[in-house]
Amino acid sequence: LEYVCVLTELGKVCGGFGLSVAAHNSLCIGHILQHGNEAQKNKYLPALASGEHIGAWGLTEPNTGSDAMRMQCVAKKEGNEWVINGLKTWITHALSADVYVILVRTGDLLDSNGISAFIIEKGTPGLSANKITQKVGVRASETAELYFDNVRVPAENLIGEEGKGFKQAMKVLDGGRISIAALSLGVAKGAYEASVAYAKEREQFGKPIAQFQAISFKLADMATECEAAELLCMQAADMKNKGMNIT
């Protein structure tokens, strides 16, 4: 519930910054917290939670967004390491992250048990990124393509069991949907507050336009929808806190 309130307030003033906070917490930290072992949690979470380190989470590829089981980024086991090759895109913090949680294919194409999650550290040889600059909005949130060229990852950086990454990702995204809903609520509330302020300032026919019924109706509708959205966000957050299914 507190997290929803924080993201809502951030969304009022800067959707891009709020999105960065959501990606860091809901996705990267959330994945390790929910599915990592104790050694992984102890190694990575303190610096991520304090803000000393920035986290990124990678699922999307150029031709696989919602259709994640068609991903082409592949990891092959070689001794005590996994070797990753491929490309991810639209990855928040891909350039600045210290820690990455990446979903890759370790089994057959279209097999939901053929995807695994790995923790990759900044500076790992073969890992590089290219910033995406042509964005319509949320430009304060860094977005980039992430390249893997024979990136070697220790076997202990596998999160959970091999082949369970897809199921892990779906659970992580459940919580992520609440954070994006809260962020969107903040954007809406910010727009509403700006609209009210302008309606009180702008004058026509000798009085503020807020006093005209047609304008008041629109503002009332906006306020009603914001209130309804806030209640739904809070309900979803409360259900998640109780361990209930929210999707």
Q: What residue spans do the PLM features occupy?
A:
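Residue-level signal for inorganic ion chemistry
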Residues: V6, N37, F118, F148, ...
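A short core secondary-structure module
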Residues: N85-A129
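Short Gly/Pro-enriched turn/cap motifs at secondary-structure boundaries
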Residues: L48, N63-S66, W90-H93, G107-L109, ...
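Charged, glycine-rich active-site and insertion segments that engage polyanionic ligands
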Residues: G243-T247
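Glycine-rich beta->alpha junctions and the first turn(s) of the following alpha-helix
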Residues: K12, L127-A228
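A short, Trp-centered hydrophobic/proline-enriched beta-strand micro-motif
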Residues: G51-L59, L103
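A structural signal for short hydrophobic beta-strand segments in well-ordered beta-sheet cores
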Residues: C73-K76
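Internal helix-loop-helix
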Residues: L1-E52, T92-V99, D111, K240
